[in-house]
Amino acid sequence: QMLGFRGSAEVVGASILTLAVGQLLAFGWTATFLAYAAGLVVLVLFLLFVPYGKGEAHESKQKTEEAAKLTRSMLQLIFFLAIGAAVIVCTNTAITFRIPSLMIEAGFGDAQLSSLVLSAMQLIGILAGISFSYLISAFKEKLLLVAGVTFGIGQIIIALAPSLWVVVAGSILGGFAYSIALTTVFQLISERIPAKLLNKATSYAVLGCSSGASLTPFVLSGIGFITTDGRMTFIILGTWMIATSVLVSFLLKKEA
């Protein structure tokens, strides 16, 4: 449940910043970089309110050695989940990059309107966070597969959309599934990895997320060699997401 609330808080911030970027466009594209100033607010709040006990820096050598030991099966589990997280984040970032151009190409709206669509896509993550506890109870280990496939379908709906409202519907479906899928990755880690090893395992999953975001421009460039059509780009991304979800879920089932 706390993982769900964390996901909700994340998307609130992301949607507010996306909306702010859309409004800052009126002052020129360079003004949009002011959105990064929000990081300074986060830093100040972190320094003021997050407790840091000095005793934590003096952990026993025994605990440190124990925390360093991840078994082969654990490493495989973490690797598969990190790959899944990388593709989830990569495709989501690609959507953020490509929805504005797709809407302009299709005549559905301009860059400012696309920022509203992206904000709606992210705000639905609040509902995803609230409902995560129920969904994980209902689908259990199949939730990653269900959410990943749904995320891919959302992207394909965007690609085939005949109107703005269908783009909005596909974006909302994709945004909901994205939040659920990414939260499920960390839930599976916390469920299957011992508490003393959880920090290390989580750091690998976060590395997967960061890798996915950083690889997005290269992935889009690679797709650009295949097609320059915006709709086809979303179909490729959606298919990739579905295939990855099926593969990762299959590998996780074998490891269970």
Predicted regions and their residues:
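Symmetry-related core transmembrane helices of the 12-TM Major Facilitator Superfamily/SLC fold
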Residues: 33-48, 233-249
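Structural signature of the two symmetry-related core transmembrane helices
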Residues: 143-157
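Intracellular juxtamembrane helix-capping segments at the cytosolic ends
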Residues: 1, 180-193
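Cytoplasmic helix-loop-helix junction between adjacent transmembrane helices
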Residues: 1-9
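Extracytoplasmic gate region of multi-pass secondary transporters
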Residues: 77-118
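Helix-to-loop junctions at the C-terminal end of transmembrane segments
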Residues: 128-140, 224
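Flexible cytoplasmic inter-helical loops of multi-pass small-molecule transporters
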Residues: 48-70
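A late C-terminal transmembrane helix in Major Facilitator Superfamily
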Residues: 195-227
